[in-house]
Every structure is written in C-alpha cells, then in structure tokens.
Amino acid sequence: MTVVTRFAPSPTGFLHIGGGRTALFNWLFARHHGGKFLLRIEDTDRARSTDAAVEAIFDGIKWLGLDWDGEAVMQFARACRHAEVARQLLDEGKAYRCYCTQDELTAIREEQKAKGQPMRYPGIWRDRPATDAPEGAPFVVRLKAPAEGETIIADLVQGDVRVANDQLDDMVLLRADGTPTYMLSVVVDDHDMGITHVIRGDDHLTNAFRQYQLYKACGWEVPTFAHIPLIHGPDGAKLSKRHGALGVDAYRDMGFLPEAMRNYLLRLGWSHGDDEIISTEQAVEWFTLDSVGRSPSRFDFVKLTNLNGHYMRGADDGRLTEVLVPLLEAKTGKALSGESVARLRTGMTGLKERAKTMVELADSALFYVAERPLALDEKAAKTMADETATADLAAYRTEVKELGAWTRDTLEDAARRLAEARGQKLGKIAQPLRAALAGSSVSPPIFEVMEVLGREESLGRIEDALGGTRPTTSTAA
C-alpha cells in the first residue's frame, strides 16, 4: 500500500502555526514511508475564502520547505461530485430528505435544552413516507446514521476511541440550496484522492465518528486516523495570538529560518529520545506516529528563538547574506551597493555569532552598510567625548596608518603594542575604536571589523569620529 496523506486548510486567513505543524507531520509521515503528500484547499465557505489567503497558504508551506505532490485540489470545484454522492445515498435508502423548518428545529433544540437533554436532531423525517412531504417545500438531505451500537476508531495517536451511536444524530449532507456540507465534501475528497492516513488536530476527533459512518454508508474503505494534540501557550491555555498563534509568515518576518521552525514544530508533540536538534533528513528517517504524545504541547517563544540562533550560526554565510540584504534595504530605504553586500558577506561569520533572528542580525549589521559620517549611539558618543579615549584612538590611527598588511592579526598586534607603550590594557584601545567603527559599544571582534571594512573605510571612520561626529540617523551605502 502506498501511503497518501493530505493537508487541507481553509483559506479564511493566514497559515497559523498549528496548521504548519499539521502540514509538517503529514509531510514527514508520507516521506518516511515513500508515499505522497497532497494539498487540498477547503474553500467551500465562499463568504470567507479569499485568493489572498490561498496564496498565503501556498507561500507558508513553501517557506517551511514542504513540497506537495501533484496539483493542489480546490474543494469548491468538486461540489457537483459531492452532491452526486449524496444523491446516490438517497437512491440507496442510506440518506433521506428532511423537511423540518428552521423554526421547528429551533423549537426542538429549546425543548431539549429545557429538559437537560443533548441537542440532537431526533430523526423526524427518517422513516416518514415521501407522500407526507409538503408540496414544493425545501428540504435538506441527511445521512441515515446507525441508531444502535457504537462507532469505534482505532486512532494511531489517541488509541481506541468510541462513541455510542445514539449520541450522534443524522448529519446534513446537502443543504436546502443543494450545496454539500463540509462533512460530506471532506469524506468524498479524501476517498477520491486515495488518502490512506488522516493526520490532523484532535479538535477534529468528534468529526471522525460522523465521517466514519459516512464512509461505511458509501461502502468505502475508512482511512486510518491520527489525531494530534493541539498546541497550548506557556500557561497551558489554548494557544492564542498573545501566546504566539501567528501566521507562519509572521515568524518569517520576525527573522526565523525555515529549518529552525521545522525543527521546533517537530518537537511540539513528537520526540526522538533526548534529541533536540534534528535535521530534516533525520526527521524523515525517524518520524513515526508512535512517538507523538497525547498531551498538548506548550509553545515556548524563547526556546524557538534560541533554536533559531543555533541554526543561524550553522547556516551558510552566502545564504544568510541573501536573506539579510532585503531586510537592510527595508531598514535604510536604499538599495545596497555591491561593495556593501560584499562587506556583509565577508563579515557574516562574526555577525551571526551574536544574533538569534535575522531581524537581530540586520540590526547588528547596519554599521557595515552605513554611510559616513557614522552615527554614534549614546554610549559610543559618550566614549568619544572622553579626551583620553580620543587620544588613544588618535595614537592608534597613527600606529596603523602606514601598516603593511591590513589583517585582524596585524591590527590587533598594533593595538597591543600601543596599549603596552601607554601602560594600558587592550580594552582601552578597543573601546573608542569600536565606537568609531561601529557607532556602538557592541560589535563583532573589532579587529575583524577593521579587516572587513578595509583600510580606507576604517581610517575614514576614525577620522570622522575624531572630528566630532554626533548621533544622527545612519543611511545605507
């Protein structure tokens, strides 16, 4: 048997983080078994479905690095097929027309509520002859669900789950306007797409019982279900926007790398021993549903950020530069020159050691692409206001101005010689040097910075600082 999974989001908003994890688990399960991962857009809610949301879903899945097989299926386009199945069930006596009005149904629910009874449709038209039907009256089509016994689902995550059939009513398959309901569309599409495993959030578990009954009524093989626990916030409450229930695109914009997000989402509910850092290749090899827990996972933004820092430190410098350039151009409002981009690429090794997100990296890299005279932050300006610091900086400028090889080693050696000659520690030389070159009290190793900037730019920034540059707004070169 070829394993076939699917991810089936509704295009009524962004691809949220829980949906991203569901897509990942389906993708991993399919790839682990050498099967297929399909994508279906459940756009039957025409009032809320938008083209922009569809594109956001596509973009989010692609950004996560999840490829799907074949063309994405648009559910609304298959409405005729869904209705066809309902009519076939009518012909076979497995479904029936219900002529109850909304007022009648409301009255039934209110009576049940008053008596403390479960609010379920009582099957009024289930066995009534067609001759009782009001002439020309609108009707819905309902499934004639089993009234006795129980429905049992062997769930790969939750174990055996069961419900007494008298707890389920006869669900609507076709509305009064002839359009299919979500429950009908899902079952027909999963069958026609050959889905073997339905992996989704456990908030769909109650739907599974009704869908199971519909599969049986149609005489189709029921797929294997796996309902994964939802993601909660750090406080144990259902994940919301205040916890970080944002769209996948928001995490991209906050500067997270897709490989870090994949790793983090994987560990939200799935484990492989004590392994925390898991590559995508390892995840494909190791992923099984046996290792998915039954308890909700808690979203930890700090842990995600630290994990992202790990992946940034190990990422290719050229790739990080490509991601960084548009962020810096957005910050500065100017296109970066080829020289600035080359400078970023050369200095990336030092830059990425400190940053945990691409946004942090962009903030820390601004000084590399800033135009002269360089803006100084408050601490750097205070340093340059100190006469001893400026004297040390001026002396260092003289020391390196005619230096032969402009490398971090020769530049550091020159600073050490000067510090020793002036009876100071190296930090006393490095502090004003960092202020002049980076406009800040924090930067990558300062002699590495000088090597990246080059002789002309470094000496020019030192001259600017000694000339009394004050804090302004930096712009890109």
Swiss-Prot record:
Keywords: Aminoacyl-tRNA synthetase, ATP-binding, Cytoplasm, Ligase, Nucleotide-binding, Protein biosynthesis. It is found in: Cytoplasm. It comes from Paramagnetospirillum magneticum (strain ATCC 700264 / AMB-1) (Magnetospirillum magneticum). GO terms for molecular function: ATP binding; glutamate-tRNA ligase activity; tRNA binding; zinc ion binding. GO terms for biological process: glutamyl-tRNA aminoacylation. It catalyses: tRNA(Glu) + L-glutamate + ATP = L-glutamyl-tRNA(Glu) + AMP + diphosphate. Its main location: cytoplasm. It is an enzyme of class 6 (ligase). It comes from the Bacteria. The keyword ATP-binding applies. Its EC number is 6.1.1.17. Catalyzes the attachment of glutamate to tRNA(Glu) in a two-step reaction: glutamate is first activated by ATP to form Glu-AMP and then transferred to the acceptor end of tRNA(Glu). PANTHER family: GLUTAMATE--TRNA LIGASE (PTHR43311), GLUTAMATE--TRNA LIGASE, MITOCHONDRIAL-RELATED (PTHR43311:SF2). GO terms for cellular component: cytosol. A motif ('HIGH' region) lies at residues 9-19. Monomer. ATP binds at residue 241. This is Glutamate--tRNA ligase 2. Belongs to the class-I aminoacyl-tRNA synthetase family. Glutamate--tRNA ligase type 1 subfamily. The keyword S-adenosyl-L-methionine does not apply. SUPFAM superfamilies: An anticodon-binding domain of class I aminoacyl-tRNA synthetases, Nucleotidylyl transferase. HAMAP family: Glu_tRNA_synth_type1.
